[in-house]
Amino acid sequence: MARPLQRPAGLGPFVLLWLLLPAPSGRGVQAGRAWPVPRCPAACEPTRCPPLPRCSVGTAPVLDRCGCCRVCAAAEGEACGGPLGRPCAPGLQCLAPRAPRLLGGRPLGTCGCPAAGATVCGSDGRTYRSLCALRAENRAARLRGALPAVPVQKGDCGDPGTGSAGWLRNKFNFIASVVEKVAPSVVHLQLFRRDRSPLGSEDVPVSSASGFIVSEDGLIVTNAHVLTNQQRIQVELQSGVQYEATVKDVDHKLDLALIKIEPNADLPVLLLGKSSDLRAGEFVVALGSPFSLQNTVTAGIVSTTQRGGKELGLKDSDMDYIQTDAIINHGNSGGPLVNLDGDVIGINTLKVTAGISFAIPSDRIRQFLAEFHERQLKGKALSQKKYLGLRMLPLTMNLLQEMKRQDPEFPDVASGVFVHEVIQGTAAESSGLKDHDVIVSINGLPVTTTTDVIEAVKANDSLSLLVRRKSQTLILTVTPEIIN
């Protein structure tokens, strides 16, 4: 009887498992051999890093895959990846071939420029498919001892440097497009006063303002409060050309004025948009020349399109102002407030405090211009009007609290009209009125709104003002000017 075959003790089932596995050839074993990959140290110790070899020309040392030791980066066309994870030089990618080679069980690739990228123009006049391609060309140029090219602009060399229309800079720089369209029609106003002395007379600059062109033959809209009687008005265009201007129409209730210059050629004009279509939250741009700095631009959003005059304390006013947080400074008055289409939707008028500014809606400007043209057609002369020379606000509770916060010595009053600004060279300045005064009464009658002041000016040739200034109580006499 044949004895059963005995398997050696200790082999257990491993022999059977080995017998079930196919026997690989020697070549296959070598190709599938797993090379050990060094582990990254728990803590980086640069003192234990191997010496850095001399890197090839055009490449710089980079950190290894562990982020600890410096190694030579692979240049374009050199191998990358592998068991040690050799990195490519900055700007290059490790591109794996369709049939990747394996080293130590890890794929090997070749460093190269990424396929996608914006074209750039080099100083050598050549267009490169990407900034990476230009740098790669520079590395090759250094090896040849040639002069490397410098990137001079984005886009092709034939482009004027604006770049691709899809770039974020062009896509979202909508305000720059508005300014480019509007700025040529915004003008700077310089107002002069004639000072007479025994030695002669001279024109002294007293204030500056802004305006915008509404007709090709030189009609310009600005604020009424920036104009004073017997002043010379000089208008400077964006090109730097200067003209003398004459006043054509003034409406102090609307705070609008129309002046005229005689240009040598047609001027660029701004179109009036419909302020009634404006929505709260829209972007707006304010242009002007505050502090005589031409082409000053601020941007903001519309807080409300109908800040009623009655809400501001103007009980007899039917004006609805545009409130915005676009900055309006001294000298910015009279400049346009435009929407993103470049249409005028208001005229910059007043800044109450930081982040709160007001503009007269363009629908009122359109009405003002229509009435002027109607008078021109009928041949009516411009009537004479009285002018005090103030920018004022009703002293509401909110304004009183804000002024108390800014100036602890602000007068302790319950009502009145706040003098925001005294225009230089006017009757108001001659009377002794100053900025931040509070007019309490005129000719013995209390005033609480700007309309009260306007009606008093119309009805009287001489005004006796009861004024509070800090802790002082003053009585000032003023005679309004007569202007055309």
Curated annotation (Swiss-Prot):
Occurrences of domain PDZ (ranges): 390-472
Pfam families reported in the protein's UniProt record: IGFBP (PF00219), Kazal_2 (PF07648), PDZ_6 (PF17820), Trypsin_2 (PF13365)
Subcellular location, record wording: Secreted
GO cellular component: extracellular region
Catalytic residues identified in the record: 225, 255, 333
Principal location listed in the UniProt entry: secreted
Positions of disulphide bridges: 40-66, 44-68, 49-69, 55-72, 80-94, 88-111, 113-132, 121-157
Keywords: Disulfide bond, Hydrolase, Protease, Secreted, Serine protease, Signal
EC number annotated for this UniProt entry: 3.4.21.-
Chain ranges of the IGFBP N-terminal domain: 36-114
Function: Serine protease.
Listed name of the protein: Serine protease HTR4
Organism in which the protein naturally occurs: Bos taurus (Bovine)
